[in-house]
Regions:
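N-terminal charge/polar-biased segments
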Residues: 112-150
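Active-site rim loops that border cofactor/substrate pockets in soluble metabolic enzymes
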Residues: 11-17, 21-71
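Flexible, glycine/charged-enriched surface loops at secondary-structure junctions
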Residues: 1-6, 35-45, 132-145
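Short, solvent-exposed amphipathic alpha-helical segments in soluble enzyme
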Residues: 22-29, 88-93, 123-128
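A C-terminal functional module that forms or caps the active site or interfaces directly
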Residues: 56-103
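Buried hydrophobic positions in well-ordered alpha/beta secondary-structure cores of metabolic enzymes
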Residues: 8-9, 74, 122
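Short, flexible loop segments at boundaries between secondary-structure elements
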Residues: 45-47, 100-115
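Internal alpha/beta core interface subdomains
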Residues: 1-12, 26, 106
Length: 150
């Protein structure tokens, strides 16, 4: 896929301050709109149903290049990602390859119950992920966290 369609998932498809993942998705979409994130078409927040079903998106009135045709699903956190991966594997027969993004380097992540194919495929897949690039103003760069000391 030359330009993958990325669905930034949340429980709902509208931005609300009460659900952090909707704010995160909106911020990522804004960054993509400004050219700070390139190489993909991002949209979100999207609920799972309208990320994978054009009919669900149509019923909910969502018009998007991504809805119903997502190539990549980005889950809001590790817990929901783990649950989604296991649901897809056990109920839909999906093959898995575990990679955690967001750290300084990609992390290969396998389950104790994973078969040999997943265990063999995950490390090279993690190694193939390019390092993160974020074109931000100097004032917006991430600084190392310091511990709070009372």
């Amino acid at each position: 896929v030359a330009l993958p369609k990325v669905a930034l998932l949340s429980a709902v498809e509208t931005v609300t301050a009460r659900i952090t993942s909707t704010l995160d998705a909106a911020a990522l979409c804004k960054m993509a709109q400004r050219g700070q994130i390139t190489g993909a078409i991002l949209d979100g927040p999207l609920a799972f149903d309208n990320a994978i079903s054009a009919e669900a998106a149509r019923i909910k009135g969502i018009t998007s290049e991504v809805s119903g045709d997502a190539d990549i699903l980005v889950l809001p956190d590790l817990e929901s990602g783990n649950v989604a991966a296991k649901l897809l594997e056990y109920l839909a027969g999906a093959a898995s390859c575990g990679v955690v993004l967001g750290a300084r380097v990609p992390i290969a992540l396998t389950s104790r119950a994973d078969g040999a194919a997943s265990r063999v495929a995950s490390p090279p897949r993690a190694a193939a992920v390019p390092p993160p690039t974020l074109e931000a103003a100097p004032s917006a760069q991430v600084r190392p966290r310091t511990r709070f000391r009372p």
